[in-house]
Amino acid sequence: MEGAPTVRQVMNEGDSSLATDLQEDVEENPSPTVEENNVVVKKQGPNLHNWSGDWSFWISSSTYKDRNEEYRRQFTHLPDTERLIADYACALQRDILLQGRLYLSENWLCFYSNIFRWETTISIALKNITFMTKEKTARLIPNAIQIVTESEKFFFTSFGARDRSYLSIFRLWQNVLLDKSLTRQEFWQLLQQNYGTELGLNAEEMENLSLSIEDVQPRSPGRSSLDDSGERDEKLSKSISFTSESISRVSETESFDGNSSKGGLGKEESQNEKQTKKSLLPTLEKKLTRVPSKSLDLNKNEYLSLDKSSTSDSVDEENVPEKDLHGRLFINRIFHISADRMFELLFTSSRFMQKFASSRNIIDVVSTPWTAELGGDQLRTMTYTIVLNSPLTGKCTAATEKQTLYKESREARFYLVDSEVLTHDVPYHDYFYTVNRYCIIRSSKQKCRLRVSTDLKYRKQPWGLVKSLIEKNSWSSLEDYFKQLESDLLIEESVLNQAIEDPGKLTGLRRRRRTFNRTAETVPKLSSQHSSGDVGLGAKGDITGKKKEMENYNVTLIVVMSIFVLLLVLLNVTLFLKLSKIEHAAQSFYRLRLQEEKSLNLASDMVSRAETIQKNKDQAHRLKGVLRDSIVMLEQLKSSLIMLQKTFDLLNKNKTGMAVES
């Protein structure tokens, strides 16, 4: 029957009409939105259009692309130029805790919550924030941040990493107050810090995002024309790349060069290595354009001051397009050392690196010579052991380092080397690695600029606590490592320049001393422990001494552990004897108790037997009396029967006599 509607059809029609009425009511009375001082607060209200989106809101997106699409979909009133930088899971404290996500862009701080179709949307312009503080939930748990504007206070809690979230918001807030905008490099670095290297964007989307950032961002008043020209030149020279950013390069917290097995290299060997190196270096067919050197530490969001000597020598410096890593810039300094000499110091088996490795407790170094690859790059592999003596990481760890000299390098003018190191024995070593990039740029005949940038990369994403532990230990180790490397290079610079000075020219000597006032001021206190005479010493004796110290340490440790084990054995023997005594006493007590129970049972048995005998005797006596009485009664019965018989006989005789007579 096609014309008659079924019961299910009627119910569906009723439900759809009810839903239509509710939807029309919500559309006629939408959730009110109030805007005060660029603080947009969308009042709470049900959202019937986004019922399917409730579950997608709670399921965390895994890539930056998904998060950015959520951000654009949830905050449509924001300018199109705003790009998501970070987002954090948190809760807004109102009458109840509204669990949601906090989205951070360059100029806005937004919050979105969707709990069972009940939406809350808040947008705060960073320039309108008067102050922000770290707070504690219930005055006990340090996981909250309070944002205060001129008109309202917002208390966000339940942060997984409160300090890191606070620092990111605070830095962007300060940039807005100082009227500074993020550069493309800073923007990409912040994305990789928050979302990792896997952003979910293809090459076209990444290029469009970069171009939109460069085109839209206004020039900050505080930025110099040199920075602007540098950015323009960087745009023009972006087609010249030294390496693909998609290739992960392994490195570690401490990277060095040196071969302990060749500790006693002489000048002839170093010259041979120099000739080999020169023969392998390719030359560029195209001259690279000049780009001003920038010293921005992207991770710390502050500008590193350049030396005065670098400014004065910038005319003679052959600058190349710089491509620092997205981590931290640890060294950016001009040294009074030629570019080729700097390369020899850092990337050959030089006495400098052997001495530096010894000071860093690096032993058992084995390295391969530079070999040319098919693509034109050159490769060098090293293995060594790092003595740590840390309770968290152990006594030592093996490491493998791969150094890549790119084909864009020019002999005695420009060197670009990536150092890839992998540690094998530290905790969570399969989760992370670091990449160190060395850029040596010729400034003049006897000067060069050394730039060292480092990035911490992950093979697989660890959970929050492990990641913070890895980053804390890795960055502190890297900072300590490169501080000492810079200090030792300054000492080597001073020694090399003193060696080439003419002692007969006093004025020249004085002028040279005035030139090196910069070095004397910037060398850390650690350099005072070194002397120029130490440079000529080989590192083999130091390494042997380290080995002996480790052997002595191992012997002492074995003795201590043996004593400890012996004490444990004695303690176990004592406990065993005491336990045996306790067991023997328990068994004796058990036997005594058993004997007592047996004796009690025997006495009770004797008493019961006597009573039984007495009872039997009484019963026998009573039975005898009964039998005696029975016999007497039987005898009486017998006598009675005899008398009766006699009576019957007498009667019979009388009857017989009477019959005869009759």
From Swiss-Prot:
Domain VASt: 326-497
Major location (coarse): endoplasmic reticulum
GO biological process annotation, one example: cellular response to cholesterol
Compositional bias (Basic and acidic residues): 265-276
Topology in membrane: Single-pass membrane protein
Keywords: Cell membrane, Endoplasmic reticulum, Lipid transport, Lipid-binding, Membrane, Transmembrane, Transmembrane helix, Transport
Entry's Gene Ontology molecular function annotations: cholesterol binding; cholesterol transfer activity
Chain segments annotated as transmembrane: 557-577
Region (Disordered): 1-34, 212-237, 249-284
Ranges for domain GRAM: 69-136
Gene3D superfamilies cross-referenced by the UniProt entry: Pleckstrin-homology domain (PH domain)/Phosphotyrosine-binding domain (PTB) (2.30.29.30)
Domain of life per record: Eukaryota
Location in or out of the cell: Endoplasmic reticulum membrane; Cell membrane
GO cellular component: endoplasmic reticulum membrane; endoplasmic reticulum-plasma membrane contact site; plasma membrane
Name of one Pfam family that matches: GRAM
Function description: Cholesterol transporter that mediates non-vesicular transport of cholesterol from the plasma membrane (PM) to the endoplasmic reticulum (ER). Contains unique domains for binding cholesterol and the PM, thereby serving as a molecular bridge for the transfer of cholesterol from the PM to the ER. Plays a crucial role in cholesterol homeostasis and has the unique ability to localize to the PM based on the level of membrane cholesterol.
Domain description: GRAM domain binds phosphatidylserine in the PM and mediates protein recruitment to endoplasmic reticulum-plasma membrane contact sites (EPCS) in response to excess cholesterol in the PM.
Annotated protein name in UniProt: Protein Aster-C
Organism: Homo sapiens (Human)
